[in-house]
């Protein structure tokens, strides 16, 4: 890849934006949103409602109380909020407070098949793998994405064998150990 003498990479989603990516993010995220807005959205939308960006137990409880069908634990990849709670640590605390069938998703820190297994073992019904997907996309387009996902699948299968489990349903919190949780 020749970044020095070829034109800069352009993102289709940024063609009409004059500022930087950081300025676009500042523009897109609305700091005036409140729980009242979630109440309004719930009244307007009768479909499944998942609230993204949950970073503590109180917010998880509030989202559920206001009618969210699911919560998505996220520090938005940790790039902007690199001092936010570790979502896998938060997951185990939140799962203790919610019914078994309440949907909990996690999208931060999933970079290896073992991360998927840890999230499932701690109670997540869904994990999101944006970073691996994007790295694969940047490196090799669709083939790169398929390869990245295949690597994660292989890691999951290998780690399940090492843990002595045959299905995701067999995973429990006893299969997860945290390093230096404070």
Segments predicted by a language model, with ranges:
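Conserved, mostly hydrophobic/aromatic
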Residues: 41, 63, 71, 119, ...
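Alpha/beta catalytic cores of nucleotide-metabolism and tRNA/nucleoside-modifying enzymes
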Residues: 89-107, 111-182
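Active-site entrance/lid segments in N-terminal catalytic domains of soluble metabolic enzymes
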Residues: 1-61, 65, 77-80, 89-92
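Glycine-rich, proline-tolerant flexible connector loops at the mouths of alpha/beta enzymes
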Residues: 75-85, 134-137
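Generic beta-strand/beta-sheet core signal
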Residues: 52-54, 73-76, 107, 129-130
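Glycine-enriched alpha-helix->loop->beta-strand junction motifs that scaffold or abut catalytic
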Residues: 44-48, 64-78, 98-101, 123-127
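Short, well-ordered secondary-structure micro-motifs
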Residues: 61-64, 82-84, 116-118, 139
């Amino acid at each position: 890849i020749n970044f020095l003498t070829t034109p800069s990479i352009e993102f289709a989603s940024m063609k009409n934006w004059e500022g930087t990516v950081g300025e676009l993010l500042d523009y897109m995220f609305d700091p005036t949103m409140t729980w009242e807005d979630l109440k309004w959205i719930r009244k307007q939308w009768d479909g499944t409602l998942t609230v993204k960006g949950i970073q503590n137990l109180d917010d998880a409880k509030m989202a559920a109380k206001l009618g969210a069908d699911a919560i998505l634990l996220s520090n938005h990849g940790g790039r902007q909020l690199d001092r936010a709670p570790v979502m896998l640590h938060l997951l185990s605390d939140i799962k203790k407070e919610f019914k078994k069938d309440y949907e909990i998703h996690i999208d931060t820190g999933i970079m290896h098949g073992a991360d998927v297994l840890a999230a499932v073992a701690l109670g997540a019904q869904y994990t999101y793998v944006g970073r691996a997907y994007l790295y694969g996309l940047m490196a090799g387009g669709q083939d790169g994405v398929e390869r990245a996902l295949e690597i994660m699948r292989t890691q999951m299968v290998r780690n399940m064998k090492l843990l002595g489990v045959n299905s995701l349903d067999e995973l429990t919190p006893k299969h997860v150990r945290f390093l230096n949780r404070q």
